[in-house]
Amino acid sequence: MLTFQQMILTLQAYWDRQGCALLQPIDLEVGAGTSHVHTFLRAIGPEPWRAAYVQPSRRPKDGRYGENPNRLQHYYQYQVVLKPAPENILELYLGSLEALGLDLKQNDIRFVEDDWENPTLGAWGLGWEVWLNGMEVTQFTYFQQVGGIDCKPITGEITYGIERLAMYLQKVENIYDLVWTEWQENGETRRLTYGDVYHQNEVEQSTYNFEHSNTEILFRHFAEHESEAKRLMGDTGEKAEGAQEKAAGTRLALPAYEQVLKAAHTFNLLDARGAISVTERAAYIGRIRNLSRQVAQAYYDSREALGFPMCKTEARA
């Protein structure tokens, strides 16, 4: 039996053999691996890219106080990004399942059409859910647009739901019973479970998300992150002659994107708290999307100004 951490190590080794850079998770709260700078921004422009990483993901509304056996407000995704998407991407994915010990002939693996969209990132793609014996374990996406910019070439994204896949491999019904790791000590097998690591976190974070987050502070933080992102994009709000031109020459896409991610997580906390109405929700999503598009364009422009250097690297190779 593969432990939870052995699963991750196996996927790391497999995708390393496929030429992926094994990266670390982004050190900010995000709702999915797609929000990582090395997926969202790297999907923009012509430069090739192959990367894989684990991404802790937070979705405050999904918290259930640690009482639901398969629903969490904090969980893990294993993210693989291949640009351009190789013709054999499905075969590569199935190979990763075999590396995890799955017999493809003995299991019902289905690709169910499910196109993907992330409104806050101004991103969408064509894709499939992957069902393993009736349970969704992976999302496949061919990015068509990111930040409102057409993807040329197309980026292929594979997002594994690590906990769900582990539940099947370990044959457990409750996520908290997953074996995170096990070892021998004094002749006995010792185990650390998912619940040992994260159950208290689910209880307390759910309590915070739904009951104790300070909405006044969160609204202020959202406005601050939005304002800072705009400033870093050269939108100073000043009308003085030359002010906008000066600011436009110092657009900082990467720091601005971090502010966008912070604004997005703050919005998710407010949404979980029930502090945003249905009509306000659409407006907030639109504000974040507009920022994402500005960042995407600024990043594209900066790479273009550099001559898309990774295209040259690939040509030399």
Curated annotation (Swiss-Prot):
Pfam families: tRNA-synt_2e (PF02091)
Gene3D superfamilies, alphabetized: Bira Bifunctional Protein, Domain 2, Class II aaRS and biotin synthetases, domain 2
BP GO terms, sorted: glycyl-tRNA aminoacylation
CDD domains, per the entry: GlyRS_alpha_core (cd00733)
The keyword Nucleotide-binding appears for this protein: yes
Subunit (UniProt): Tetramer of two alpha and two beta subunits.
Catalytic activity reported: tRNA(Gly) + glycine + ATP = glycyl-tRNA(Gly) + AMP + diphosphate
PANTHER family found in the cross-reference section: GLYCINE--TRNA LIGASE, CHLOROPLASTIC_MITOCHONDRIAL 2, GLYCYL-TRNA SYNTHETASE
PROSITE patterns the record matches: AA_TRNA_LIGASE_II_GLYAB (PS50861)
Record keywords: Aminoacyl-tRNA synthetase, ATP-binding, Cytoplasm, Ligase, Nucleotide-binding, Protein biosynthesis
EC number of this enzyme: 6.1.1.14
Protein's name in the database: Glycine--tRNA ligase alpha subunit
Gene it is expressed from: glyQ
Originating organism: Cupriavidus metallidurans (strain ATCC 43123 / DSM 2839 / NBRC 102507 / CH34) (Ralstonia metallidurans)
Gene Ontology molecular-function annotations: ATP binding; glycine-tRNA ligase activity
Keyword Hydrolase: no
Subcellular location: Cytoplasm
